[in-house]
From Swiss-Prot:
Keywords: Glycosyltransferase, Transferase
Gene Ontology terms, MF aspect: quercetin 3-O-glucosyltransferase activity; quercetin 7-O-glucosyltransferase activity
Annotated protein name in UniProt: Putative UDP-glucose glucosyltransferase
Gene giving rise to this polypeptide: GT5
PANTHER family, alphabetized: GLUCOSYL/GLUCURONOSYL TRANSFERASES, UDP-GLYCOSYLTRANSFERASE 84A1
Family: Belongs to the UDP-glycosyltransferase family.
EC number(s) from the headed UniProt entry: 2.4.1.-
Enzyme class: transferase
Length: 475
């Protein structure tokens, strides 16, 4: 183990403050550190405080990881109240973050080049903060982007921005979309933020900002697998330097450390899982952002009761700033369930999905959850809501063959009833279809293990990235 000095290749990661962004970015950081680099992970002070409380992170203190170090440095988003509701108003918050972030991140990077410190060799950003590329350009530093969704979704945003493919419009809202090297996507299977009537259009504009600055990114690192999306990766590699480096959570160097990006402490549920028979438990989680209507939660609960399956259900309390109430379960639900089910506020998801008692995963189909299920060999029941989730669900069911579709997203505008929930859960856990789904899931698990093994496609791409940054920093 060496020491931190001016000769370390220094990678500075700037991450949008959200759980689904922090996890893959931190995994990338741990891998780079393990390979002998100095890595600084930066996001807003608001989220930094949550990471300190949940994981014992210490600011500015280089923590050894493998042959290198990782350190944390946070910047103030200028909103002193941790429960300020304006953080959930992205029309307000995304521009604010750019305004304050540009100045503060620039200052942080300049500081590292002074007084004999390790000057920054490369900046890495992720969606919603494309201004990091501007900072890199102004400082004459290479910039890479960590794309935390699938390559298929990347292709959709790229072609929408370039206007090379027709997408739904106000005049033709139900237009299907044919992207190069992908199956036909129905109008409700494209990333919903690109739909003209989507209520979260600000998110689409925020993501598209990355594509308007695509030429400023030397690399597009993707948390996907070359062999998972071969045709699309090849197609997109013709227009930008796409490097699949996933699944980041499976890379050994990114897992052999206690440093985690969780914003709240996970509940203990592994002993309970170990008390259940193999392939018997349904895991239910809708991620850190999705908030279902109370009546939908009721229908899921009744469907679980009717199915009789054992389940582990993550019911995360909403942030105060979100202005919504905590879900409640139907009267008598917990008494009827008994030890057949367990509710937690947060879980160690990777360990849960890897547990032998898991039968399937009822998921919102965020890309982190999708890739974790795929590469841990777990079949899924898809319950997407918006954004890339609807596209991921299409691929999980129709392309990868590991899932059953329970709904199509909020655009479907309907309540999924308890009978549908019961039928889908039973089909995914018992019988011929369940066997087929598991067979396909195990196939993708093997693909993922080969990709992250030494000499695998993702390891090669990561090595290439490190070598290029090292050459650039020497020059």
């Amino acid at each position: 183990m060496g020491s931190v000095g001016s000769d370390n290749t220094h990678i500075f990661l700037v991450c949008y403050p959200a759980q689904g962004h922090i996890n893959p970015m931190l995994r990338l950081g741990k891998y780079l550190a393990a390979k002998g680099l100095l890595v600084t992970f930066s996001t807003t002070e608001d989220y930094g405080n949550k990471m300190r409380n949940a994981n014992g992170i210490v600011d500015n203190h280089p923590t050894p990881v493998g042959n290198g170090f990782i350190r944390f440095e946070f910047f103030d988003d200028s909103l002193p109240d941790p429960d300020d509701p304006r953080r959930t108003n992205l029309e307000f918050y995304v521009p604010l973050l750019e305004k304050v972030g540009k100045e503060l991140v620039t200052g942080m990077i300049k500081k590292h080049g002074e007084e004999g410190g390790a000057r920054v060799s490369c900046l890495v950003n992720n969606p919603f903060i494309p201004w990091v590329c501007d900072v890199a350009t102004e400082l004459g530093i290479p910039c890479a982007t960590l794309w935390i969704q699938s390559c298929a979704v990347f292709s959709a945003y790229f072609h929408y921005n370039a206007e090379t493919v027709k997408f739904p419009t106000e005049a033709e809202p139900e237009l299907d979309v044919q992207l190069p090297s992908t199956p036909l996507l129905k109008h409700d299977e494209i990333p919903s933020f690109l739909h003209p009537f989507d209520p979260y259009a600000i998110l689409g504009r925020a993501i598209l900002g990355q594509f308007k600055k695509l030429s400023k990114s030397s690399y597009i690192l993707m948390d996907t697998i070359q062999e998972l999306e071969p045709e699309i990766v090849e197609e997109m590699s013709k227009v930008c330097l796409v490097k699949p480096v996933g699944p980041l959570f499976k890379i050994p160097e990114a897992t052999n450390t206690t440093i985690r990006g969780d914003l709240i402490k996970a509940d203990d549920c592994l002993d309970w899982l170990s008390s259940k028979p193999p392939a018997s438990v349904v895991y239910i989680s809708f991620g850190s952002i999705v908030y279902l209507k109370q009546e939908q939660v009721d229908e899921i609960a009744h469907g679980l009761l009717s199915s009789g399956v054992s389940f582990l259900w993550v019911m995360r309390p909403p942030r105060k700033a979100a202005g919504v109430d905590m879900h409640v379960l139907p009267e008598g639900f917990l008494e009827k369930v008994g030890d057949n089910g367990k509710l937690v506020q947060w879980s160690p998801q990777e360990q849960v999905l890897a547990h032998p008692s898991l039968a399937c995963f009822l998921t919102h189909c965020g890309w982190n959850s999708s890739v974790e299920a795929l590469t841990l060999g777990v079949p899924v029941v898809t319950f997407p809501q918006w954004g890339d989730q609807v596209t991921n669900a299409k691929y999980l069911v129709d392309v990868f063959g590991v899932g059953l579709r329970l709904c199509r997203g909020v655009a479907e505008n309907r309540l999924v009833l308890r009978d549908e929930v019961e039928k889908c859960l039973l089909e995914a856990t018992v019988g011929e279809k369940a066997v087929q789904l598991k067979h396909n899931a195990l196939k993708w698990k093997k693909v993922a293990e080969e990709a992250v093994a030494e000499g695998g496609s993702s390891q090669r791409n990561l090595h290439d990235f490190i070598d290029e940054i090292a050459r650039t920093s020497i020059a």
